[in-house]
């Protein structure tokens, strides 16, 4: 247990992501030296949402750093679902494309999930396709959702065991919370998932007993830091911009850092790991075509 004067160690996602990207570059260089195609990633951006533009730029920069060739498909906001479906079909059929990334959200398209399902699961480097999530549920390793997989990598860089721990996940989105639960089950945790129907007193109790706390809600300070169990590992997936422009997470950082053993910063924690894991999935998708 931490003493009252101790502060959590910062789980530096930027540094860990950079180390992962360096390792991936070594593998890509070896692949190219062996006469194989470099991994390729089709990046589809619809419209000009500022956040999406930033996310896509970060992904393209990471691809360049690793040696993955990115093909850019920047489409107007008026692009229809039928036009996107036709593009996905072309990318699925192109043997030179190893990974397909559709940046979400898609403006004007209410059912993006239908388009995600259209991506060839072998090229679904986001890991969102139901077939890939199903593999995870069956404890089969394939193209796993990037953010949960990146969080597992982060947990491996602490000095805290994962197997046998109590883990609480706050938020049950299809892209983070639900697959995160599967990842932690596979890692040997006892998992509690909390959501909008979880009574407040039950939510607080679940947070207070968590050795590993993962929060992915998208509401600043939704989890008071005072709830954090002393010595817990806290992974804050949320990134929220306040009226003054400050970026904050879903957990009250100032008080949580005095109780946790490890905690991710916002920004600079989970986000870089998501991007690095996308590159990891893209390389693995390319390697799977060599068999």
From Swiss-Prot:
One GO biological-process annotation of the entry reads: methionine biosynthetic process
SUPFAM superfamilies (alphabetical): Aminoacid dehydrogenase-like, N-terminal domain, NAD(P)-binding Rossmann-fold domains
Molecular function GO labels: methenyltetrahydrofolate cyclohydrolase activity; methylenetetrahydrofolate dehydrogenase (NADP+) activity
Alphabetical list of PROSITE patterns matching this protein: THF_DHG_CYH_2 (PS00767)
Keywords noted in UniProt: Amino-acid biosynthesis, Histidine biosynthesis, Hydrolase, Methionine biosynthesis, Multifunctional enzyme, NADP, One-carbon metabolism, Oxidoreductase, Purine biosynthesis
- Per the UniProt entry, the Enzyme Commission number(s) are 1.5.1.5, 3.5.4.9
User: What HAMAP family does the record point to?
Assistant: THF_DHG_CYH
Q: What does this protein do?
A: Catalyzes the oxidation of 5,10-methylenetetrahydrofolate to 5,10-methenyltetrahydrofolate and then the hydrolysis of 5,10-methenyltetrahydrofolate to 10-formyltetrahydrofolate.
Gene3D superfamilies assigned to the protein according to its UniProt record, in alphabetical order: Leucine Dehydrogenase, chain A, domain 1, NAD(P)-binding Rossmann-like Domain
This protein's name:
Bifunctional protein FolD
State the reactions this protein catalyses: (6R)-5,10-methylene-5,6,7,8-tetrahydrofolate + NADP(+) = (6R)-5,10-methenyltetrahydrofolate + NADPH; (6R)-5,10-methenyltetrahydrofolate + H2O = (6R)-10-formyltetrahydrofolate + H(+)
Pathway participation: One-carbon metabolism; tetrahydrofolate interconversion
Coiled coil spans: none
- Which organism is the protein's source? Xylella fastidiosa (strain Temecula1 / ATCC 700964)
Pfam families, alphabetically? THF_DHG_CYH, THF_DHG_CYH_C
Database matches in CDD domains: NAD_bind_m-THF_DH_Cyclohyd
Gene field: folD
Q: How does it assemble?
A: Homodimer.
What the entry lists under InterPro entries is as follows: Aminoacid_DH-like_N_sf, NAD(P)-bd_dom_sf, THF_DH/CycHdrlase, THF_DH/CycHdrlase_cat_dom, THF_DH/CycHdrlase_CS, THF_DH/CycHdrlase_NAD-bd_dom
What family, per the record? Belongs to the tetrahydrofolate dehydrogenase/cyclohydrolase family.
Entry binding sites for NADP(+): 171-173, 239
- Record's Gene Ontology CC terms? cytosol
């Amino acid at each position: 247990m931490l003493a009252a004067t101790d502060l959590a160690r910062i789980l530096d996602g930027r540094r860990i992501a950079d180390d992962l990207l360096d390792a991936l570059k070594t593998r890509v260089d070896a692949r190219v030296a062996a006469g194989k195609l470099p991994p390729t990633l089709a990046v589809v951006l619809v419209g000009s949402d500022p956040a999406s533009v930033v996310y896509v730029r970060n992904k393209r920069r990471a691809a360049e750093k690793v040696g993955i060739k990115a093909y850019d498909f920047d489409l107007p906001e008026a692009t229809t679902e039928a036009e996107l479906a036709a593009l996905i079909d072309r990318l699925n059929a192109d043997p030179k494309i190893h990974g397909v990334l559709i940046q979400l959200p898609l403006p004007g398209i209410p059912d993006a999930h239908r388009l995600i399902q259209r991506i060839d699961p072998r090229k679904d480097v986001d890991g969102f396709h139901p077939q890939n999530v199903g593999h995870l549920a069956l404890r089969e390793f394939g193209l796993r959702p990037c953010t949960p997989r990146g969080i597992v990598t982060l947990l491996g860089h602490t000095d805290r065991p994962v197997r046998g721990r109590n883990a609480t996940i706050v938020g049950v989105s299809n892209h983070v919370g639900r697959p995160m639960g599967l990842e932690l089950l596979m890692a040997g945790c006892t998992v509690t998932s909390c959501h909008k129907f979880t009574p407040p007193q039950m939510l607080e109790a679940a947070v207070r007993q968590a050795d590993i706390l993962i929060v992915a809600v998208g509401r600043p300070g939704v989890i008071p830091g005072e709830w954090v169990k002393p010595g817990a590992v806290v992974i804050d997936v949320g990134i929220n911009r306040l009226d003054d422009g400050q970026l904050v997470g879903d957990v009250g950082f100032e008080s949580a850092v005095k109780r946790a053993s490890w905690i991710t910063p916002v920004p600079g924690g989970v986000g870089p790991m998501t991007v690095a894991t996308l590159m990891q999935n893209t390389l693995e998708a390319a390697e799977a075509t060599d068999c």
